[in-house]
A protein has these predicted regions:
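Positively charged, low-complexity terminal tracts
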Residues: 1-71
């Protein structure tokens, strides 16, 4: 049975989307994946990424956030 572990849940203040992060561990073992679920009203976007992609994406998000003017 696939194991799903909730990691975090966020709500975007502008737009109201819900972002849910989960760790996915499959029965057969191997690599764990990060599932990202974005809910926009009744529409869902779901994708799973490997640790290396998650690290690159996370760094890109941090670079962008740090370059923004404080609110």
């Amino acid at each position: 049975m696939t194991r799903v572990t909730p990691l975090d849940k966020l709500r975007v203040p502008i737009g109201g989307q819900e972002i849910e992060l989960q760790q996915i561990d499959y029965d057969g073992g191997g690599i764990s994946l990060l599932r990202t679920r974005i809910r926009e009203k009744s529409r869902f976007t779901v994708f799973e990424i490997d640790p290396q992609t998650a690290e690159l994406w996370g760094r890109a998000l941090l670079r962008w956030a740090q370059a923004q003017e404080p609110a």
